[in-house]
């Protein structure tokens, strides 16, 4: 939850194909969520819950560009249904390309991230969200210290567009680069 009025950020793959989305808080309060927008290419979705008279606790964005290899990171999630699980590690790499497209370069962390952590926050030691936990690389299916998060600075821009327009607007340049052969040059 990133605002007191009930804006929720998660991964697109968490909500993809859902007919109904329910957000469950730590105190077991349940809210039906409205999908404001999603970006499958960046794997981000923005939801809205109506807090009614409930005061929501929310988190703030940090500056992911300030993170350096070796900085501490803290992941919170719901791995295997174990809600509120907190793990810690370090930033292992920045701007990691996983080959999933040109839109996001990931923060890599060795904080334990497992199935169920997707869409959860990756924090710095100041309690600011520096990333959205998104993926792991593992041959066993469990965490082996190769976790990846969408950097907050990338996510913030996408989240704002999803809130404003329901989709992400990207520029596109219709240019194709190819070698100039002798025949083509003539």
Kindly give the residue locations of the regions a language model identified:
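Serine-dependent protease modules
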Residues: 1-186
């Amino acid at each position: 939850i990133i605002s007191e009025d009930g804006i929720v950020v998660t991964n697109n793959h968490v909500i993809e194909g859902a007919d109904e989305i329910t957000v469950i808080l730590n105190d077991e309060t349940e809210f039906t969520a409205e999908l404001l927008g999603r970006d499958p290419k960046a794997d981000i979705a923005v939801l809205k819950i109506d807090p009614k008279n409930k005061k929501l606790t929310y988190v703030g964005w940090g500056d992911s560009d300030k993170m350096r290899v070796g900085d501490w990171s803290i992941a919170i999630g719901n791995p295997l249904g174990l809600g509120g699980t907190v793990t810690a590690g370090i930033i292992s790499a920045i701007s990691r390309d996983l080959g999933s497209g040109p839109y996001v370069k990931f923060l890599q962390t060795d904080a334990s991230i497992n199935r169920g952590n997707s869409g959860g926050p990756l924090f710095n030691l100041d309690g600011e969200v520096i990333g959205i936990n998104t993926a792991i690389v593992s041959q066993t299916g469990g965490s082996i210290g190769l976790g990846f998060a969408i950097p907050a600075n990338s996510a913030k821009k996408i989240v704002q567009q999803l809130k404003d327009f329901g989709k992400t607007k990207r520029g596109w340049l219709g240019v194709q680069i190819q070698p100039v052969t002798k025949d083509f040059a003539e």
